[in-house]
Amino acid sequence: MYAIIETGGKQIKVEEGQEIYIEKIDAQEGETVTFDKVLFVGGETVKIGNPTVEGATVTAKVQKHGRQKKIIVFKYKAKKNYRRKQGHRQPYTKVVIEKINA
């Protein structure tokens, strides 16, 4: 069984036991979180939401919080001596999907 959930402005396909990286959420490590925005549930029977599936939830356990690799944003204009360098590290949360309730 799998499901498509929406979290952090993104849609993610998840299965039970899968480890996924999502946008940072406000939860402590080891805490259980519930995702209510389930858009699709697949398996032997298929449930499609309009826009979400009624009564369907996905529970997950927070493993850790972290920051991704640094990306460099560099602005440059030729012949004008204009250079701007800025770095950014996006925070994330690693969760393990425990159960899909459909």
UniProtKB/Swiss-Prot annotation:
Superkingdom of this protein's organism: Bacteria
GO cellular component: cytoplasm; ribonucleoprotein complex; ribosome
One record GO biological process: translation
Record GO terms (molecular function): rRNA binding; structural constituent of ribosome
SUPFAM superfamilies registered for this protein in UniProt: L21p-like (SSF141091)
Assigned keywords, A-Z: Ribonucleoprotein, Ribosomal protein, RNA-binding, rRNA-binding
Pfam families cross-referenced by the UniProt entry: Ribosomal_L21p (PF00829)
Residue runs in coiled coils: none
Quaternary structure note: Part of the 50S ribosomal subunit. Contacts protein L20.
Reported function: This protein binds to 23S rRNA in the presence of protein L20.
Family label: Belongs to the bacterial ribosomal protein bL21 family.
Protein name (Swiss-Prot/TrEMBL): Large ribosomal subunit protein bL21
Organism for this UniProt entry: Geobacillus sp. (strain WCH70)
